[in-house]
Amino acid sequence: MPYRIRPDRPLLGEVRSVARRELERAIETLETRPEGLHEAIHAARKNFKRLRNLYRLVLTNDKDFRRTENARLRNAGRSLSHIRDATALIETAEHLAEHALTGDEAETVAAAREMLALRRDEIAEAEGDLQAKVTSVIEECRAGIDALAALSLPSKPNHAARLVAKGWRKGLEEARSALEISKGEGHGEAFHDLRKAAQAYWMNLLLLLDLWPSAFEAKRQDAKRLVDLLGHEHDLTVLTTLLDHEPDVFGNAEGVSFLLAIIIRRQQELRRDALALADRVFADTAKDEAAIIEALWMRYAGDRR
């Protein structure tokens, strides 16, 4: 079943169904590992991100439940993140290689990739308690499923519409704020916040795709493109931080400086493209979009009653 909630059905049942499905998929993937343990961890963390986004959208009025379950999901994801984060840096080097301008740049990036791969392997060997962490996360997923019994949401369509619109508006306000800060100060944390807001918007468009399939699918494609640009940008920020904290991983100082110059150039390109696209993705005001969501929800619910 898709990551979707239908306005013509009780909101509580829809949210519980999606939440249970994400947690059950995470459990199944971590237990069966069809593509290996590390891919299973990567997939489970995606389940957690989707569920955290769902709670962020619909639980603006139930802060206690949201706070508790958000902490559960955040901690579960973090406990499994070490090796995945190290693997992501290898993928970042591969992205840089695709944008190398000279042979010297290509050689420098290739050498960095080899060193990052060695670092990832060392981390994997050192993380001897990974299986215990996976077992603990599976237990937390089951506890998260049990917690759904305590979830409370409005049953009337107009109240549900207002609640979802409130969450939608809050997300877009955060996106606009992050966008303006990114344009002004341009620091890595602002772009990271913009990425998180864009990712939430992309997932929300999927959640409510039934409201207006053609328009939401077009917006979702633009949002996904923005998420990808900002994802690469953030990965380069993480790689820069590693260069600062563990320069020995990358060899001599001259090589580190050359690699940093390559990173900065690509990061500037990504930021320029992302800001231009973000202006289009978040062109409408949060208030106007929220009003549209509320109206579409009521129309959809009314047409199918």
Question: Can you describe what each PLM-predicted range is?
Answer:
Residues 1-305:
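Function-determining surface determinants
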